[in-house]
Regions:
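Generic detector of leucine side chains in alpha-helical contexts
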Residues: 17, 25-26, 63, 69, ...
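Short C-terminal domain-edge/linker segments immediately following a structured domain
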Residues: 49, 60-61, 70, 95-98
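Short, charged amphipathic alpha-helical surface segments
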Residues: 76-108
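Amphipathic alpha-helical dimerization/coiled-coil segments
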Residues: 55-83, 87
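Basic helix-turn-helix/winged-helix DNA-binding cores
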Residues: 1-65
Length: 108
């Protein structure tokens, strides 16, 4: 899948995909002999994961740590689990604040 196809499918700009690759969120993206990116199934799973996490408001720094640890192997499983648990807790706090805001808006 080309960058244009991935961009359209996942509703992410090509610049964002290039940025994710540059900062290490999408490492090892395969390229054709002419240098054009060729996203495979694994790359697409990472894009879906990153998009889901970013849509939820998870910080890029946390995702970079997670991806870096993932590629270090199974011995980092607990550290990765901890990163996701911390981000999950932050999301619950954020969700609680949003619910309170919605309650106020509904009251007005």
């Amino acid at each position: 899948m080309t960058i244009a196809e991935a961009s359209k499918k996942y509703e992410i700009t090509a610049d964002t995909l290039r940025y994710y690759e540059k900062i290490g969120l999408l490492p090892n993206v395969h390229r054709k002999t002419n240098g054009i990116r060729d996203y495979n199934e694994e790359d697409c799973r990472w894009i879906e994961f990153i998009k889901c996490m970013r849509d939820a408001g998870i910080e890029i720094e946390a995702l970079i740590k997670y991806v870096t640890l993932f590629y270090q192997g199974d011995e980092t499983r607990e550290a990765r689990r901890q990163i996701l648990a911390e981000q999950r807790e932050k999301l619950f706090i954020k969700m609680s604040k949003i619910e309170k805001s919605l309650e106020r808006l509904n009251y007005k």
